[in-house]
Amino acid sequence: MKIINLLAYQILDSRGQPTVAVKLFLENDQSVIAMVPSGASTGAKEALELRDGDVNYFFNKSVKLAIQNINNIIRPHLINKNVLNFFELDNLLINLDGTENKSKLGANALLGVSIAIVKAGAIAASKPLYQYIKEDLMHNYDVNYYAPIPLMNFINGGAHADNDLDIQEFMIVPLNAISFSQAIQIGSEIFHQLDKLLKSNHLSTTKGDEGGFAPMLKNNYVTLELLVHAIKKAHYLPSKTQGVCLALDVAASELYENGKYFFKKSSSHNITLEQTSFSSDEWIKYWSKLVSMFPIISIEDCFEENDWNSFALFLKNNPHIQVVGDDLYCTNLKYLQKGIDFKATNAILIKPNQIGTISETLDVIKFAQKNNINTIISHRSGETEDTFIADLAIGVGAGQIKTGSLSRSERIAKYNRILEIEQELKDKLIYEPSKFFKFR
């Protein structure tokens, strides 16, 4: 089926900042829309998100140039092309840009088109998007699918919230569920108990960028204790082996300066009872201690994005948890290979906009899975209502998804899409934490 037109235009993300939307038209009068997310704490290795730098138009944040690149440069090369030739078309996008970091046309331009081609391909193949991804792009024809375990961000800090918490995400992980819908039920019940606990302690229930609460709390210990309390109040067991677990995204590159790690936000207000400055060795001991004290099953970016040795040592000392690389890898095959050589992590966060095309994203996922590295499909803090990553998570069999809290419609949309897929697949959609957390 042929592409007959392509139109890019500017929309707003969940932070009210401009981003790219792409509408692709097929010869059967059907069309699809793809919307591109944007991050706040970004890794230095990420592909370039092209913005205009015009102080008089959206204060430097406009994406007019990326849109012009789609409409004027990319579009003519795609008209009348067969949308089912996905890898050929994606390779065309990569070659049109011709740079390693997508700096000519912009990763936000390429990704919008790449996602639109995948969505349109599913229509042309008369398949649900997740099935098209699995069969036609991953070449996996197993009749069963795996539901992603949700890592739900209930307390926001760092660059995602205007509070005194340096750690970016405090998440709950319902490993005790037997289905995705039950995992969402468990998460919702804990989320609302947390809301009650915050109110009873006269703490703010305002939300951060990803829909989690953003209260002023003294330190990480207090925050983790609060989450454990909320789990218990919802009548669940906080446990790494048979209950509800915790997960963290430290975003440590934001806390690293001149060879040391610092809790910057909390120490500036003198509210922390913790040490605030750490060498790499002290930082390893700090997180190892937290893991021993709380039911933490997963820690993401606990070291600066070039501190490969510390990642490797931490994983060696803590083999029974998931150590995740995000800024460490930036969904880039070259860096993932380095991480495998270092034995730096046992999991990778997958963000398509870090690399710029879906074909390259799939290459990273396939390579990770081949090397027994867990894959976690992730949103960005600046999101849209596009639910593509929900289908992607199921289509590639990622096993885990990070798409925020149980509030804010751009986050809920992804959860609701997976619930919809669960209704379609019924018992063919398997929720199996033991498959993806074998190291427990």
Curated annotation (Swiss-Prot):
Mg(2+) binds at residues 249, 300, 326. The keyword Protein transport does not apply. Its main location: cytoplasm. (2R)-2-phosphoglycerate binds at residues 168, 351, 380-381, 402. The keyword Cytoplasm applies. The active site is at residues 210, 351. GO terms for molecular function: magnesium ion binding; phosphopyruvate hydratase activity. GO terms for cellular component: cell surface; extracellular region; phosphopyruvate hydratase complex. Pathway: Carbohydrate degradation; glycolysis; pyruvate from D-glyceraldehyde 3-phosphate: step 4/5. Transmembrane segments: none annotated. Its cofactor is Mg(2+). Its EC number is 4.2.1.11. It is found in: Cytoplasm; Secreted; Cell surface. Binds a second Mg(2+) ion via substrate during catalysis. Pfam families: Enolase_C (PF00113), Enolase_N (PF03952). Keywords: Cytoplasm, Glycolysis, Lyase, Magnesium, Metal-binding, Secreted. One of its GO terms (biological process) is glycolytic process. It catalyses: (2R)-2-phosphoglycerate = phosphoenolpyruvate + H2O. Belongs to the enolase family. NCBIfam families: eno. HAMAP family: Enolase (MF_00318). Catalyzes the reversible conversion of 2-phosphoglycerate (2-PG) into phosphoenolpyruvate (PEP). It is essential for the degradation of carbohydrates via glycolysis. This is Enolase. It comes from Ureaplasma parvum serovar 3 (strain ATCC 700970).
